[in-house]
């Protein structure tokens, strides 16, 4: 398909690399203009420049999503540069390990801040214009860890579970005001830094087989798998979809 996002303007947090970059690339192919927002401004700008070929419009901006002034300024700059936002993808996130009894409190706070507070602050900044124009779509990033319990990942499960329910609450607030809100919940995506962190360092065939056994489809995900789901949720093909937690996990949560 093509032009599903024609004339749309999409901001993507964590857009400089990995899944965020794959979403940006897919959105451009579908006719959107994109703003890549990343903690590493240089990375965001380099990635945007790489994508800006053949008339594609991509711009990079730096922001710490845990700081209201930062993310508000980035979204304001994006709107001034490429146009009023019609879509926001809250992709920025971090993971970490630890059960409740041995979790580091500072690490807990940081995981909550980037994942949950970052989603809140970016959404708050984008919603001002979306509600005024009565038009917008927000895609939050949950995870299979927000749908089921994952051993030794207390903070990450709590954060992603919070995002899934925040998505439902936002849909209840804003769907009648022209703004759809959904969450995409990926399974393991091995080619990203977070995916490698979640899988650990043991890549022996026996361990790999045990990991793959959790995925009925027989493989791990790719950034492009997740990007295609996000594009669907951003597009008018999902015009009747709001408040959904969309599992893109190769069947992991089905068994």
Swiss-Prot record:
The keyword Zinc does not apply. (S)-2-hydroxypropyl-coenzyme M binds at residues 143, 156, 188, 215. NAD(+) binds at residues 19, 38, 64-65, 91, 160, 189-193. PROSITE patterns: ADH_SHORT. One of its GO terms (molecular function) is nucleotide binding. The record marks 160 as: Lowers pKa of active site Tyr. Changing residue 156 to A: Retains some activity but with more than 2200-fold decrease in catalytic efficiency. CDD domains: SDR_c (cd05233). Changing residue 211 to A: Severely impaired in the oxidation of S-HPC or reduction of 2-KPC but largely unaffected in the oxidation and reduction of aliphatic alcohols and ketones. GO terms for biological process: fatty acid biosynthetic process. The active site is at residue 156. Changing residue 156 to F: Loss of activity. Its EC number is 1.1.1.269. Involved in aliphatic epoxide carboxylation. Catalyzes the reversible oxidation of (2S)-2-hydroxypropyl-coenzyme M (S-HPC) to 2-oxopropyl-coenzyme M (2-KPC). The enzyme is highly specific for the S enantiomers. In vitro can also use the aliphatic ketone 2-butanone and the aliphatic alcohol 2-propanol, and shows an inherent stereoselectivity for 2-butanone reduction. Homotetramer. PANTHER family: NAD(P)-BINDING PROTEIN (PTHR42760:SF122), SHORT-CHAIN DEHYDROGENASES/REDUCTASES FAMILY MEMBER (PTHR42760). This is 2-(S)-hydroxypropyl-CoM dehydrogenase 3. It comes from Xanthobacter autotrophicus (strain ATCC BAA-1158 / Py2). The gene is xecE3.
